[in-house]
């Protein structure tokens, strides 16, 4: 017997004009994982799209098809914009703003939400300075959710974000230097990062 999950996480889908069928298949599999683990929620940690400057029509319609698939399956999608979903890194707006579905919860700025009795902090991609501002706002809300008894003392705190933190190694082996330090997240149960 499989355990009940709070959500299923996916990051960095990178939908482009050549991989629509593959990405649709990934979401079909995610829906099946949701069914298997008795959840109706997918969390996407950014980069639905690949192109920063413009989206080909096929990408826009493929994403709409995926959202229709999620709706039909009764699956909710929490999503944050990644760097590939924006034209301006410090703008809250992204290509994801053009899709208005009740099942899609777009976290455009730092937010703290209670899901299944646990706290989820969502911080989209921004430049480091703006990211810190958004994180601090969301973290204050998280702290107040615990202080005001909105969640149990032993509830987990999850950070879902799209950023490069200090000390992270890139695929090319280079190391990220950033004002965002891992030590800032000591109160979090898990920090789940896309980029």
Per-region residue spans from a language model:
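Mobile, glycine- and charge-enriched loop segments
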Residues: 1-23, 144-145, 151-164
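Core catalytic region of metal-dependent phosphoesterases/phosphodiesterases
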Residues: 3-6, 13-113, 184-188
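Structural motif
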Residues: 5-7, 40-41, 118-119, 156-158, ...
């Amino acid at each position: 017997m499989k355990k009940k999950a709070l959500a299923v996480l996916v990051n960095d889908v990178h939908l482009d004009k050549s991989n629509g069928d593959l990405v649709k298949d990934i979401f079909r599999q995610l829906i099946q994982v949701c069914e298997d683990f008795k959840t109706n929620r997918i969390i996407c940690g950014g980069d639905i799209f690949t192109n920063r400057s413009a989206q080909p029509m096929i990408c826009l319609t493929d994403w709409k098809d995926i959202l229709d698939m999620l709706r039909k399956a009764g699956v909710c999608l929490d999503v944050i914009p990644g760097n590939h979903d924006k034209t301006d890194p410090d703008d809250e707006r992204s290509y994801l703003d053009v899709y208005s579905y009740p099942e899609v919860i777009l976290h455009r700025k730092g937010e703290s939400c209670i899901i299944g009795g646990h706290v989820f902090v969502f911080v989209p991609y921004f430049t480091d300075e703006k990211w810190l501002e958004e994180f601090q706002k969301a973290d204050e809300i998280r702290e107040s959710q615990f202080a005001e008894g909105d969640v149990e003392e032993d509830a987990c705190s999850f950070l879902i974000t799209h950023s490069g933190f200090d000390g992270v190694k890139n695929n090319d082996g280079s190391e990220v230097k950033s004002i965002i330090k891992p030590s800032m997240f000591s109160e979090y149960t898990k920090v789940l990062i896309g980029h």
